[in-house]
Amino acid sequence: MRVIDASGAIYGRLSAYVAKRLLEGEEITIVNASKAVITGNKEFIIEKFKERLDIGSVRKGPYYPKTPENILRRSIGDMLPKKITKGKEALARCRVYRNTPPDIEKEKVEKVDGVVTDKVSGIITLGDLSKELGGY
């Protein structure tokens, strides 16, 4: 089992990296999902996510997540072929946590190369986005 720290990681790049590893058969646990970031204009990102929430109805959906861990898990799931068994099993091997749980603190946590922000202007964390959507 691999434990990946999402602190400062770019949301889409991290999701693509994890989805690929899940299809290869690895079990992956992601911690600190609320600290993952989306790059771009903060107001535009919030507006786009709120537009998604307004689509459909309460009874029929589609249902979009509001919490950081579910937003990240949904983006990973959207990159997997869910209609076939391989994709369903891959998503079942993925665990996402808002913070670091006590039982995982003891394990080796790694950062993924190439997905961490260094000098990017205009970012919003999934935790802040979740607060704007009303899901924290």
UniProtKB/Swiss-Prot annotation:
- For the keyword Lipid metabolism, the answer is no
Q: Which family does it belong to?
A: Belongs to the universal ribosomal protein uL13 family.
**Does the keyword field hold Lipid metabolism?**
no
InterPro entries in UniProt: Ribosomal_uL13, Ribosomal_uL13_bac-type, Ribosomal_uL13_euk/arc, Ribosomal_uL13_sf
HAMAP family, sorted: Ribosomal_uL13
How it assembles, according to the record, is: Part of the 50S ribosomal subunit.
**BP-aspect Gene Ontology terms:** negative regulation of translation; translation
Pfam families named in the record: Ribosomal_L13
Kindly state which keywords UniProt assigns to this record, in alphabetical order: Ribonucleoprotein, Ribosomal protein
**Name under which the protein is recorded:** Large ribosomal subunit protein uL13
